[in-house]
């Protein structure tokens, strides 16, 4: 189970926010403070991790709409990448799995673009970065962990 999520440049959240998830998590706030945006983020993440789509994100997942255009997801609508982080903690094995991604938007094509993603495992004794991909161009990513370029279509 994912125990924490963090996000930056998402909807009305310019600064990095971290939410610790428990079996029951309650969001309280004034109108237009971002409660619905946070809830929609959960379906956005679920859709992305589920691998059901060709895009990094889909604006509609399980009949929940996150916006009309992909730039609706970005704080200020353009010029920034959404940064998302997910942490899964295993208290028995005393380790954390950490996934971080950054997604920008091609406004002309109305498509999300995966800029970077990394995955690491952290335990009491060390931190092992398993993947750290950075986008070089439209079809090429570089993994900083093994110094290898990967071509994608």
Where are these regions (language model features)?
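P-loop NTPase switch/coupling surface
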Residues: 1-153
